[in-house]
């Protein structure tokens, strides 16, 4: 036994010496990328470390100070998804986003060039209303109502924007799990939010990705009960607006609904005071009404208003 150990030690020593001197082998340095750029040898940026509690606190510190905002954004809606093999973008849409805690949101989109109203949608966190000017169509229903239109843009929901634009910290029903996802091409933390499934098992409800170079939030993925992706949102150009940090570029993709929206913030006013009427969307006279049933029921067909 002692002889075997001595032999193993000698072999290990020889192997280490061989590799240390290259032993005639071809040695290649692997390129390390950070933000898509090669790292210069000896100048590797320092990676920041944090616990799951500290990362959740960062989310809280971003979320809590914002009670409202009014933003002007350049919006690029897109139809399709990577799962469908095709994505078509609609360029140069200007939009105005109004938000008030806890869940009031209104988004008014303007057509390219002429800047007439393309759509107007509002939600109080429970129900939503959407007016599509090109079709003179007024849609209303629960936030949880299914996407039923063959026109993906008619399936826009204000709540989908809100859940992506404002990143919530962990709720009382969520458990946190932290993973270090650092390799040659990226340096990230992945913070998983777990909820209890119907049979008591842990189910991932969302994942938030942090850049380890500065611990900024780079991405948020929200999952359905089966693990499918409801939304995949990427964040960039974090900017301070009125002493509050907010991403100036937000790229929302909703593969199950078949659409996405990229937004670039042009102007932002934080913690603005709104009146209730600012979140009131009245049905235009002569528009067709489509009511999407509650609890997943089918949408009622569009109908004209009574005379």
Positions of the model-derived regions?
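Post-signal peptide N-terminal segment of secreted/secretory-pathway proteins
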Residues: 75-119
